[in-house]
Amino acid sequence: GLRMIGTLAKYAKYLPNGFITKLLEVRVTLLPPVARLTSLHQPQKLIEYLSRHPEPTESETTFAYYDWELQMQITRLSGNPVYALIFNDFASMFKKMAIPYFRSEMSRSASLQYYSYLSKAVAHNADTVEEVVRFAMQKSIEIWHEVRGSDASVHL
């Protein structure tokens, strides 16, 4: 089951190359429609959270915490508590990968752009929220490959 993801995070050095990419692809599938639901049910709370994004000069740890909490806010505010339960199982793996990911200025810059676009989409057009989130999640896979190298392995 999903609890396996937390266990796998403990033994990340044994995961096959490309495993993290597969997890990120799952996120591309799950998070965009959930974000759309959140923009319909609780847009103001999401906009409020997005307004507190980190500054470009803040640490990778700050970015990692903020970004993970954004994903959890999206799932919690969606109106369906099952989404939060599913994403919560990704927490340990995400935290393990997020610090090296956010060491890159490119990652932080792309994330800040995503937060801005998402805030505007939530405020003006719920239909574009899904597209904004999907694009950002796909872009994060590309950045992960650049940051971690061609094999995108998990040897963090």
Task: State the predicted function of each range.
Residues S51-P56, Q71, N88-L156:
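C-terminal all-alpha effector/ligand-binding and dimerization domain
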Residues G1-E69, Q73, Q113-F135:
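All-alpha effector-binding/dimerization core of bacterial HTH-type transcriptional repressors
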Residues S59, L77-N80, S104:
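Intrinsic-disorder/low-complexity, polar/charged segments
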Residues R76-G79, I86-N88:
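Long, low-complexity, charge-rich intrinsically disordered regions
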Residues L30, V82-Y83:
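Short phosphate-engaging motifs
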